[in-house]
């Protein structure tokens, strides 16, 4: 469903949620609203109109940013791993692999591989790194907070660092986290675990986060 927000088009997606959620998506500032299944369209529109000025400010910020150069996954490019920059070196071989060594990341790719194929292999390698690190850190945070998720998975999300389904007690972590400092992973884990107890982002939520992570604001800035 599409609605108009004072001249701004917005996509409305109905979900099994309790509260409205409005997101301005990079890189072009598209607007998406997640809404409860039975909430009237008039209520959604009224909510969106109250956010019109904020939406315009966010869109202006996004459109004024220089576009990031798209990686081609070729030798000489710089790629991030846990907040550290590595120089990519690509070689051809019969078996795909990614091997870190010093300040270099060696990507062994099939002969005549495409950019999309190399990107896909790198994404899976990032996923492996995230699973290994989160597999160690998530249980530690569960023990510290007393908040336990039923299951957790990884997903290559480009607009969110993590999500939590509090009813199913399931947490999703973005594969993109493997590019950021590991302190950011801790923040996102704690953030999503806290949603098992507090579903919104109100005062109680941030107080719960700060109880275990006083520097959460600094960590969140690293994710911008």
Residue ranges and their predicted role:
Residues 1-187, 196-224:
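Active-site-proximal or metal-binding-adjacent scaffold patches in catalytic folds
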Residues 192:
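Walker B catalytic acidic pair
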